[in-house]
Amino acid sequence: MERLKTWVWDHKVPVLIGIGILIVLIIAFALWRTFYYDNKKIVLGVDVSAYQGEIDWEVISEQGISFAYIKATEGTDFIDKRFNENWTAARKTNLKVGAYFFVNFNEGGKDQAKYFIKNVPKESGSLPPVIDLELYGDYLDNPPQKEKVNTMLKEMIETLKEEYGEIPIIYTNYNTYNQYLSNAFTEVPIWICDISSSNPELSGGHQWVFWQYSQRQILQGYDGEERFIDMNVFNGDTKAFKAMFN
C-alpha cells in the first residue's frame, strides 16, 4: 500500500499534466472542427426512397441538410411508391430537390429516360436528373459489355438533356465507374459512392460533384423500415453550390 501511495505521489504531477494536455487537445479539436465547418460552409444532402417511409421534410431540412435526391423510377415500368408525395413535400421546403432513376441493363436507354421524364415534372429550381448506374445481381459477376452500356448511357444523357435542358449526373460506385466511366463521358458530373475513404479520387478525367460518404446515418423525420439514410456532400462550398445549381 505504501508503495502504491509513493507511486501515485511520484506520478501525480505528470498524470495531471497529461490530463491537462488531453483536455486542451479535445477543446482545440472541437474549436478547429467548428471553425473548419463554419468557414468551409459544407453542403450536405440526403438521398431517399420508399424504404425511408413517410418523411417529414421540414424536419429533415432543419438538420443541416441543403439538398435531397428522391428515387423516382427503375427501368420502364416501376415508379417508387412514395416518389410523388416526397417530391411535392420536399419542394415546399428550402431544400434543393432532384430525382434519380435506377438503370436496368435489360431495357433500352432512351426508353428508360422517357419513363423517368413521364414521371418527373420539369420544374424550375430542381437539381439535375441523376442516372443511378450500378452493377447488380448476376451482373456483378458477369458485367454487361462496355459498348452496350455506353450506348445506353449516351441515349439516356441525350434524352434527359433535351427534356430538362441540362446534363444529368451519374451516380455510381468505383467498381462500375472503372468498368464503364473512366475516360468516358467526361462532360458528365459524377456522384461517387465511397464509404471507406476520406478523400474520394476518380481516374480518367472526372471530378466528383457529389460524394456519398455514408449509408448508415440516422436522422430525425422518417419512419420507414430502413432506419438509416444515405448522406452526401457537395464538392464545394455554399457559394459554389448556388452558382452551379441556381
Where are the regions a protein language model picked out?
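Substrate-binding cleft of extracellular glycoside hydrolase catalytic domains
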Residues: 38-54, 71-157, 161-163
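Flexible, glycine-rich phosphate/dinucleotide-binding loops
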Residues: 77, 106, 177, 199, ...
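Membrane-interface segments at or immediately adjacent to transmembrane helices
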Residues: 60-66, 74
